């Protein structure tokens, strides 16, 4: 996957850096694996905004991606590499030997015609799914289950990878993309390789309109609002914390800069090293 820049013949082209889509082999998704996707506009069932900056955007179909990879010991062939509007990485359409089709996340290096398989004793090559206990140490993996059989939850975004660093007492120690080291049950399945579309982080939309196509609305700074609209609003000119207020706050009045992680969270028992450990 590569990026391409454009001659600045228009203002929107000056800073635009878009993917080349060279790896995409078809523009038509598998109809049997698509479902309708309804927009909420960031509102709940009462019509109130629960998530800001959501609204509009192009109509999408949801692709049913197989995160469990629980069709064991049946080889599959990669038919296509496709764009998925609902995630940052590409997806691959695979067809099993018995004729069943499914979508999986497309790791770096996966190409049309390659064979992939899921099982206990499969080879540790790109696209294969296997339990953590059988993955060689130092291997890059993605789509990792938190509980056996629950389906992959960790390291699924574009360019993400986790490293199997060690094993102890029925657990595998995984170095997460954030740098955190966490214990996973070694019976949890994962997929070998790094998630594709590794240059996604370097994309630039070039104009506000493309961001709106993605369903993202503008973000207005609280400092520029009135006091009735935001705790940081009001004051004369560019007042840092509003008229007479002492601390920057969230829209709901919580002071910025405080730790938000809940004390005695159950996952504390599986975190060996925090991501910000010195």
Curated annotation (Swiss-Prot):
Keywords, sorted A to Z: Ribonucleoprotein, Ribosomal protein, RNA-binding, rRNA-binding
Name by which UniProt lists this protein: Large ribosomal subunit protein uL2
Region of interest called Disordered, as start-end residue ranges on this chain: 32-54, 221-278
Lineage: Bacteria, Pseudomonadati, Verrucomicrobiota, Verrucomicrobiia, Verrucomicrobiales
Keyword Ribonucleoprotein attached: yes
Function: One of the primary rRNA binding proteins. Required for association of the 30S and 50S subunits to form the 70S ribosome, for tRNA binding and peptide bond formation. It has been suggested to have peptidyltransferase activity; this is somewhat controversial. Makes several contacts with the 16S rRNA in the 70S ribosome.
Species in which this protein is naturally found: Akkermansia muciniphila (strain ATCC BAA-835 / DSM 22959 / JCM 33894 / BCRC 81048 / CCUG 64013 / CIP 107961 / Muc)
Amino acid composition bias (Gly residues), ranges on this chain: 232-245
Residues in the signal sequence: none
GO cellular component: large ribosomal subunit
Matches recorded under NCBIfam families: rplB_bact
Recorded GO MF terms: rRNA binding; structural constituent of ribosome; transferase activity
SUPFAM superfamilies in UniProt: Nucleic acid-binding proteins, Translation proteins SH3-like domain
Any one GO BP annotation for this protein: cytoplasmic translation
InterPro entries assigned: NA-bd_OB-fold, Rib_uL2_dom2, Ribosomal_uL2, Ribosomal_uL2_bac/org-type, Ribosomal_uL2_C, Ribosomal_uL2_dom3, Ribosomal_uL2_RNA-bd_dom, Translation_prot_SH3-like_sf
Family membership: Belongs to the universal ribosomal protein uL2 family.
Presence of keyword Ribosomal protein: yes
Subunit annotation: Part of the 50S ribosomal subunit. Forms a bridge to the 30S subunit in the 70S ribosome.
Annotated PANTHER family: LARGE RIBOSOMAL SUBUNIT PROTEIN UL2M (PTHR13691:SF5), RIBOSOMAL PROTEIN L2 (PTHR13691)
């Amino acid at each position: 996957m590569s990026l391409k820049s454009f001659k600045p013949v228009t203002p929107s082209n000056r800073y635009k850096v878009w993917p080349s889509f060279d790896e995409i082999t078809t523009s038509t998704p598998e109809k049997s694996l698509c479902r309708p996707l309804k927009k909420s506009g960031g509102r709940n069932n009462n019509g109130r905004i629960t998530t800001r900056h959501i609204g509009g955007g192009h109509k999408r179909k949801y692709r049913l991606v197989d995160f469990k990879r629980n069709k064991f010991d049946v080889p599959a062939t990669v038919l296509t590499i496709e764009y998925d509007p609902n995630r940052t990485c590409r997806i691959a359409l695979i067809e099993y030997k018995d004729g069943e089709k499914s979508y999986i996340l497309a790791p770096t290096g996966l190409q049309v015609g390659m064979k992939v398989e899921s099982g206990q004793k499969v080879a540790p090559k790109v696209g294969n799914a296997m339990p953590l206990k059988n993955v060689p140490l130092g291997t890059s993996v993605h789509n990792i289950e938190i509980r056996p059989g629950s389906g992959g939850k960790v390291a699924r975004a574009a360019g993400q990878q986790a490293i199997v660093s060690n094993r102890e007492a029925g657990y595998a120690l995984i170095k997460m993309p954030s740098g955190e080291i966490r214990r996973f049950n070694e019976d949890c399945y994962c997929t070998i390789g790094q998630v594709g579309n590794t240059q996604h982080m370097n994309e630039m939309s070039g104009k506000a309109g493309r961001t709106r196509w993605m369903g993202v609305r503008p973000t207005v700074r609280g400092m520029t609002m009135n006091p009735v609209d935001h705790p940081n609003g009001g004051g004369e000119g560019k007042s840092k914390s509003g008229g007479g207020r002492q601390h920057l706050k969230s829209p709901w009045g919580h002071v910025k800069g405080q730790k938000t992680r809940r004390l005695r969270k159950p996952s504390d028992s599986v975190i060996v090293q925090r991501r910000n450990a010195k």
